[in-house]
A protein has these predicted regions:
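Histidine-anchored nucleotide/phosphate-binding helix
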Residues: 1
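Ferredoxin-type iron-sulfur electron-transfer modules and their immediate structural context
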Residues: 4-11, 23-140, 151, 160-192
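Short, surface-exposed alpha-helical segments at coil->helix boundaries
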Residues: 12-16
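Catalytic machinery of carbohydrate-active enzymes
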Residues: 20
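Accessory beta->alpha helical hairpin/"wing" motif in late/C-terminal subdomains of nucleic-acid enzymes
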Residues: 146-148
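Conserved SAM/SAH-binding loop-helix junction
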Residues: 157
C-alpha cells in the first residue's frame, strides 16, 4: 500500500536540503543527485536499486573519509556532528573565495538565522519565550536579544509570536565557527 502523500513530500523536502548542502559544499555537481529516494516493494527490487546507485554516476564528486563519531540518541547532536565532518572535508572551503554561508531551500530547512528589524523590535522577549530550541535567548544582565544559530531549527514560532513583526527567518547553513557562538541581534542601554 502507498504511504500518505505528506510523507513523500516531507522526504522530498529533506532530500532537497541535503542536496543543497552537498552541492554548496562542493561534494556534488549541480544536476547530479547523490541523495535519492528509492521506491521498492520487494527485497530484490531494493537490492537492485541499491546496486544501481552504488555503481552508477550518482556518487559524490569527492571522496569523504569515514566519520569516526558514534551516533547519538538525540538526532540534532548527530546532525551537528555530520555537518562538522562534512565541513572539515568540504572542497569549497579549501578555496580562497570560500563562502561564509550556504543559502538553503526555505521549505523544511533545519538550519538558519533570524533577522531582526531593530527599528521595530522593542526587546519584549516574546520570541525568547516561544523558541523551543533555545536559539533565541535573553541576557539577565542587560537588555539584549541573543541568538545561537546552531540551535535554530527554523520553526518560525519566533516570527509568529513577535507582536512587532520584527523577525524574519533566513534559511542557511553558516560555514564559519560563529554558528556555534551566541551573538547579539538587538540591544539597548539599560536605564539607570
Amino acid at each position: 500500500a502507498e504511504e500518505a502523500p505528506q510523507y513523500a513530500d516531507g522526504l522530498q523536502a529533506q532530500m532537497a536540503q541535503a542536496q543543497a548542502m552537498l552541492e554548496g559544499l562542493g561534494y556534488a555537481k549541480a544536476g547530479r543527485m547523490p541523495v535519492q529516494l528509492v521506491h521498492a516493494t520487494q527485497a530484490m527490487e531494493l537490492d537492485a536499486e541499491l546496486q544501481r546507485l552504488t555503481t552508477g554516476q550518482q556518487r559524490l564528486s569527492t571522496t569523504v573519509p569515514a566519520a569516526t563519531f558514534a551516533v547519538m540518541a538525540e538526532k540534532r547532536s548527530t546532525l551537528s556532528m555530520v555537518i562538522d565532518h562534512l565541513l572539515e572535508h568540504a572542497p569549497v572551503l579549501k578555496t580562497a573565495d570560500a563562502p561564509e554561508a550556504l543559502a538553503l531551500p526555505k521549505d523544511g530547512s533545519p538550519f538558519g538565522s533570524v533577522e531582526v528589524n531593530k527599528d521595530s523590535c522593542t526587546l519584549c522577549m516574546s520570541c525568547v519565550s516561544a523558541c523551543p530550541a533555545n536559539a533565541l535567548q535573553d541576557n539577565q544582565a542587560a537588555p539584549q536579544l541573543r541568538f545561537f544559530e546552531k540551535n535554530c531549527v527554523q520553526c518560525g514560532l519566533c516570527v509568529s509570536t513577535c507582536p512587532e513583526k520584527a523577525l524574519n527567518l533566513v534559511p542557511r547553513l553558516l560555514l564559519t565557527p560563529q554558528r556555534k557562538e551566541v551573538r547579539v541581534l538587538n540591544e539597548t542601554q539599560p536605564y539607570g
